[in-house]
Design a protein with these regions (language model features):
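Single conserved hydrophobic/aromatic residue that forms the stacking wall/gate
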Residues: 1-12
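Generic long, charged, amphipathic alpha-helical segments
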Residues: 10-26
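Metallocofactor- and cofactor-centric catalytic cores in central/energy metabolism, strongly enriched
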Residues: 16, 23, 40, 82, ...
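Extended hydrophobic secondary-structure segments that form protein cores and membrane-embedded regions
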Residues: 199-204, 232-236
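Extended, charge-rich low-complexity interaction segments
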Residues: 28-48, 99-114, 181-190, 195, ...
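Short, surface-exposed amphipathic charged segments that create phosphate/polyanion-binding patches used
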Residues: 13-15, 84-93, 168, 244-258
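Internal gly/pro-rich beta-alpha loop/helix module
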Residues: 233-267
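Peripheral docking tails and interdomain loops at the edges
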Residues: 34-37, 45-118, 123-127, 219-221, ...
């Protein structure tokens, strides 16, 4: 709160969608701490909140990219804090060892370079879309393809996709995020697609749900797998992101709306 109230650590390009003031304070504090040799940060959170999966990943990236040690303590509603004390003592020991090395830190940005989906890419790129509703999404695929896109709805919404998602997504995140990211990564790792001619599309509401940060989950997974060159297209109506090669035109919106209605009827 002190860092945020004094405007410290504010100039920071985030990977994630900043949804709550709680997030804003954490990111501002981490961004300030990474610039100081006399400060370190311990993040405290509770068990079971999917939003914490977003913040822990982002704070970790901010600190570790600049050579700081990241520590997160999960504290449930219990009186015994013995485990937390052990973690703090371990952090202090690690800091002392780090100081003895006298390593010179380089302060780096933690944001991921976001490839843009251009008009030229629209001609020959395959756009992968995770399967979230078998009735609706088969119709949405036809709607997009009739408007000049080469969109493919993935058929791999199964347990294997979840297992792949567990490798690339913070395991405190919700189940839908695991299967969405898992489908995408499973497809990209299959060897079926040219990774230099493939993009990914995902909706982004911009609201309070962690689904607003599925885009960030996908980009982080692509980075872990060495596929940063793949554009991730955000489908949103609030101007969160834009791509010159992907536009929600009136004919496309009408076809998508028809597809949603017919999907409801068929279901």
């Amino acid at each position: 709160d002190l860092v945020r109230s004094r405007g410290l650590g504010d100039v920071y390009k985030r990977q994630v969608n900043d949804q709550w003031m709680y997030h804003t304070r954490l990111y501002a504090a981490a961004n300030y701490v990474k610039t100081r040799d006399d400060l370190d940060l311990i993040q405290l959170n509770s068990f079971g909140c999917g939003l914490d999966a977003v913040t822990t990943d982002e704070v970790y990236e901010i600190l570790t990219r600049s050579g700081k040690i990241y520590t997160c303590l999960k504290i449930d509603e219990v009186n015994n804090l013995g485990a937390a004390r052990i973690r703090v003592r371990s952090l202090l020991a690690a800091l002392r060892a780090h100081d003895r090395k006298q390593a010179v830190r380089e302060i780096l940005p933690s944001s991921i370079q976001k490839p843009v989906f251009t008009k030229e890419m629209r001609k020959d790129y395959t756009i992968l879309c995770p399967q979230m509703s078998p009735f609706h999404f088969s119709l949405l695929q036809a709607a997009f393809n009739s408007c000049g896109y080469n969109l493919e709805v993935l058929p791999n919404d199964n347990k294997h996709a979840v297992d792949v998602g567990l490798k690339y997504v913070n395991n405190d995140a919700c189940y839908p995020s695991l299967i969405v990211v898992g489908q995408i990564m499973d497809a990209l790792l299959s060897g079926k697609y040219d990774l230099n001619k493939t993009a990914v599309v995902m909706s982004q509401t911009g609201g309070g749900c962690r689904a607003s940060n599925y885009i960030a989950f996908i980009r982080r997974a692509l980075k872990k797998a060495g596929m940063e060159q793949i554009p991730v297209i955000s489908v949103n109506l609030s101007g969160l992101e834009s791509n010159p090669g992907f536009k929600l035109t009136l004919p496309l919106v009408k076809k998508v709306a028809y597809g949603a209605v017919f999907g409801d009827i068929l279901m």
